């Protein structure tokens, strides 16, 4: 592998959602059988689709997956070209507030909520770049902690930088953002389970050993920046 996950943060999985239109007759995940579901291919939401369908006794053979990036999926969803949309914040909040979307299922019990920072192995082998990567990861972890304790300021900055409506940014931020956690065995196992789901669905061409794509060299350095998070 030419890349490695070097740090991880965990978000609130209630923001990872299967959305349906407000007037949809669908009441539970099992009702998705025979329906069209929009999702970004290879995304965390795609993984959530696989695991959520499995939990409901279904598979991707029971639904039609429309692989669309969020902006295209939003258009398809609002025009009712698809029956459901699997996505994350701020798109979840945007669809709820602007399109009257209803949450059919959240990521609770299926999504792990992890977001990884990845570095090139060549950069990790370079002393100068290695030091710069460590500095960046520490700054990011501190920024994530700050954003969580300064939610209104973060929501305003996010809205200003991205063009999100402030109420959408606030709704997403209020659910809780990504917070740094330790890149430990539990994280690796959880991500391995997700990789296995992708392999079983043949989205990935074969078995992937996620541990081989991790590098934990910065974990001690990040401990203080993580604060109360393990």
PLM feature spans:
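Residues at alpha-helix termini
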Residues: 1, 56, 98-99, 162, ...
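Short, glycine-/small- and polar/acidic-enriched structural segments
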Residues: 1-59, 64-67, 83-86, 104, ...
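Hydrophobic alpha-helical segments typical of transmembrane helices
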Residues: 14, 45-48, 91, 154, ...
